[in-house]
């Protein structure tokens, strides 16, 4: 989805309207929220903070901060700014690689905020807020799914009490990347757990009809749906 480039940031009211629309469509109260793409939530800091204030208010949807996760690709100054708010939400860091060589190839933001700088910011965030952090790790065949990568990842976050979500990537036309197969994802998870890191394999939903994360919006913009 991000291959189309940035258009604009959403305003707080627009983000709130997504919650109200979803509640109306399903006929149930929304109890948990994940702020995760398209785009970088911390790049829209003021509007996201306004949204969080509104959505957690008893006069709004009254969703507790502990039921809200906020994702970031690793904007270090914004992580520090968020820490100052001392919100009780869960920070979810899109790490995807345990070292700079691999991460810079996958995520250009790593050139500005390399792994060691990012991890320092995450530890500061934990110290300031007292909240556990989770790490998102997209599994890419032959890129970041080796035993060596598992060991490096464990060394990077061991002792933080953090949780790792392992996510087999969804196929996208024109991408050189493919997902790690299920057996090797499981092997990677077991390796992390043997090294003292709590890890979960994220379920893949919708990829068989190109409606999974990163797929549907791109296909719609390209006139395929």
Describe every region a protein language model picked out.
Residues 8, 40-42, 77, 209, ...:
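Short, flexible micro-motifs
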Residues 6, 142, 172-173, 207-209:
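Short secondary-structure capping/turn micro-motifs that flank functional sites
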Residues 194, 206-225:
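Radical SAM enzyme core and accessory elements
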Residues 1-2, 29, 155-156, 215, ...:
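Amphipathic, soluble alpha/beta structural segments
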Residues 35, 202, 210:
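Short glycine- and Lys/Arg-enriched binding-loop motifs that mark or flank ligand-binding interfaces
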Residues 1-13:
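Canonical Radical SAM [4Fe-4S] cluster-binding loop centered on the CxxxCxxC motif
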